[in-house]
UniProtKB/Swiss-Prot annotation:
The species this protein was found in: Maricaulis maris (strain MCS10)
UniProt protein name: Co-chaperonin GroES
One Pfam family in the UniProt entry: Cpn10
Alphabetic keyword roster: Chaperone, Cytoplasm
Gene from which the chain derives: groES
Family: Belongs to the GroES chaperonin family.
Length: 95
């Protein structure tokens, strides 16, 4: 199944953090926080402005992004956990 977000929404796959620290300590799953970094999988057609015109999004599929801790709605598509969020929830694009 394919999924295409609408308007100014973005579909994001979280980037998993390392399970071992630099010092070699293994972090159990129960102690891990969900990462706030992800990769854009798909984007909507753009934000609709007040005059009815469409503003294209600043991000594109494949961009690596940072987002807020409570951003987005979790969904599962084809067994893969993803997030749907508005472009305004994205804090920035990593270079």
């Amino acid at each position: 199944m394919t999924f295409r977000p609408l308007h100014d929404r973005v579909l994001v796959k979280r980037v998993e953090e390392e399970s071992t620290t630099k010092g070699g300590i293994i972090i159990p799953d129960t102690a891990k926080e969900k990462p706030q970094e992800g990769e854009v999988v798909a984007i909507g057609g753009g934000a609709i402005k007040e005059d009815g015109s469409v503003r294209p999004l600043d991000v594109k599929a494949g961009d690596r992004i940072l987002f807020g801790k409570w951003s987005g709605t979790e969904v599962t598509v084809d067994g893969v956990e993803l997030l749907i969020m508005k472009e305004s929830d994205i804090l920035g694009v990593m270079a």
